[in-house]
UniProtKB/Swiss-Prot annotation:
Predominant location: membrane
Protein name in the entry: Photosystem II D2 protein
Compartment(s) of residence: Cellular thylakoid membrane
Any one Gene Ontology molecular-function term assigned to this protein's record: electron transporter, transferring electrons within the cyclic electron transport pathway of photosynthesis activity
Gene this protein is translated from: psbD
Length: 351
């Protein structure tokens, strides 16, 4: 009789866990998943809970949940009260002292959602790094995704850290984001900021490049079959090109006089434009956190003040910003009890 003795594995628990995390399954987990999935679950769950049940009466003096009659466009998880400063508002912290209802009333769901959301986005970027390493491709997807992460962190975390409290961050909601955009314009003249201009150029330029690239590829597809649709005219694993780069180059050379000479430079440019635009916008928001000014054309302001017949679109915008500040502040910050006398409210030939 033969006795088979099993070989005892000399692998440690770390190697076993590493194999399990990187196992080929329908939804890849990986080490990054240990950060991504719990944080994403908490952030999404916190947002759904807050927009369904939580009021903003104690922080902003408004209604912000489905339970109070709001719809999808007007619900929000509002920022904490201005008096909370930059407290993390932990459920067990000195502010809420373990009372869940009090924690929600003070705005604890906002810090909960913001921090878990930030770590979830970082986990998603690390997930792309991890899968790229396992598959054996370059990590440019993760590098590209760093741009929206930078923008999220700068707007939702760094900007309010530069201000007096979390109160001045955007609340998590559609209409709430619109309010924040108006606030940015009125108090920082954001649209005239060069970093915002670079961000707009990057986003719109990226959209234009995508549209041009997609149309050009569709225009120059090889007719590999007699099917009615071009989607059946190729095999996903074929070694041959599915469109003609030479024809595309000739087409755009005739239109602009110049064209991309190879696919590598073309696709790098499509990556570079929107990513750098978002990065520049994020840097600009960090500047606003420090209350840095955008372009100020003081000479035009002085001349407009002295000459009622002189105005430019810049001086018009300055007056509009003053109106936003004067009329928005009492509504946006009711706890300050702002009362502006009539003589300081903006008036002039631009309004």
């Amino acid at each position: 009789m033969t006795t088979a003795v099993g070989r005892i594995s000399d692998r440690g628990w770390f190697d076993v866990l590493d194999d399990w995390l990187k196992r080929d399954r329908f939804v890849f987990v990986g080490w990054s998943g240990l950060l991504l999935f719990p944080c994403a679950y908490m952030a999404i769950g916190g947002w759904l809970t807050g927009t369904t049940f939580a009021t903003s009466w104690y922080t902003h003096g408004i209604a912000s949940s489905y339970l109070e009659g709001c719809n999808f466009l007007t619900v929000a998880i509002s920022t904490p009260a201005d008096s909370m400063g930059h407290a993390l508002l932990l459920l067990w912290g000195p502010e809420a002292q373990g009372a869940f209802v009090r924690w929600v009333q003070l705005g604890g769901l906002w810090t909960f959602t913001a921090l878990h959301g930030a770590f979830a986005l970082i986990g998603f970027m690390l997930r792309q790094f991890e899968i790229a390493r396992l598959v054996g491709v370059r990590p440019y997807n993760a590098i590209a995704f760093s741009a929206p992460i930078a923008l999220f962190v700068s707007v939702f975390l760094i900007y309010p850290l530069g201000q007096s409290s979390w109160f001045f961050a955007p609340s998590f909601g559609v209409a709430a984001i619109f309010r924040f955009i108006l606030f940015f314009q009125g108090f920082h003249n954001w649209t005239l900021n060069p970093f915002h201009m670079m961000g707009v150029a990057g986003v719109l330029g990226g959209a234009l490049l995508c549209a041009i690239h997609g149309a050009t590829v569709e225009n120059t597809l090889f007719e590999d079959g007699d099917d009615a649709t071009t989607f059946r005219g190729f095999e996903p694993t074929q070694s041959e090109e599915t469109y003609s780069m030479v024809t595309a180059n000739r087409f755009w050379s005739q239109i602009f006089g110049i064209a991309f000479s190879n696919k590598r430079w073309l696709h790098f440019f499509m990556l570079f434009v929107p990513v750098m635009g978002l990065w520049m916008s994020a840097i600009g928001v960090v500047g606003l956190a420090l209350n840095l000014r955008s372009y100020d054309f003081v000479s035009q302001e002085i001349r407009a003040a002295e000459d009622p017949e002189f105005e430019t679109f810049y001086t018009k915008n300055i007056l509009l910003n003053e109106g936003l500040r004067a009329w928005m502040a009492p509504q946006d910050q009711p706890h300050e009890n702002f009362i502006f006398p009539e003589e300081v409210l903006p008036r002039g030939n631009a309004l």
